[in-house]
């Protein structure tokens, strides 16, 4: 463990994109002892804030200098910006650099990025290892002002399995995120990731959005809500740009999960129409047992 910790401490790290997640990564990296953390962002004010908060050593708008120095790069860009970022920086990555991302969809992103990574290897001969990852943590608000590394504590982290990745690099990433506070690290294929995320993340956001938007506003709803409504709708305060991309990028899986959810809702609706108390109780008992397994 001492060797791993020493290695992590001496890494030069760059965060690409200092929004709410990128800045939280930077903050967490400093907290676990990484000495040199750079930040890349298109917004000068964001870079200035990051430097003032001492979560990065230096901020950059231009990418070449920090990428050429970095052993470890975390890209926190929106999905539609990933491909162009790699095309524009194909020659800038350091030899033996480890790169990871935080994007919530994988099959599409990997399909975009892997050909570019292969081009880097062929053109430059550089040995670069891209390990696709997904921290299962976030906040409803956006921007560096709302970044907080505490969001990672006891959260789950998914690493995408790929035979091209070096085992020692996979172990290093896994160790880093555990030090950051992530409780469980899972290894999935891209397909497995997108299927389960369609259910546990994207469907839940779709339900929250639909619940809030289904309000007829006949009454002043805010005067009559309780914890159940607050808990169910917390994630309805949503980043429309990011989540529109995530939904569309995983459309097939999400549509399947919506249909599955609709079937369950129809069972409850039919039970009500048929005065079927037994079916209602069965569904309530089933959900209680399943939820208790999560706790």
Predicted feature residues:
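Rossmann-like NAD(P)(H) cofactor-binding subdomain of soluble oxidoreductases
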Residues: 88-145
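Interdomain hinge/lid region at the active-site interface
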Residues: 218-287
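Short, well-ordered coil/turn residues at beta-beta hairpins
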Residues: 76-77, 102, 160, 202
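Residues at the starts of beta-strands that form the adenosine-phosphate
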Residues: 12, 35-36, 129, 156, ...
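Hydrophobic Val/Ile/Leu positions in short beta-strands of Rossmann-like dinucleotide-binding domains
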Residues: 13-15, 75, 159
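Rossmann-like NAD(P)-binding element
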Residues: 64-93, 97-100
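NAD(P)+-binding Rossmann beta1-loop-alpha1 motif at the extreme N-terminus of oxidoreductases
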Residues: 2-68
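Internal alpha-helical scaffold of NAD(P)-dependent oxidoreductase catalytic cores
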Residues: 151-234
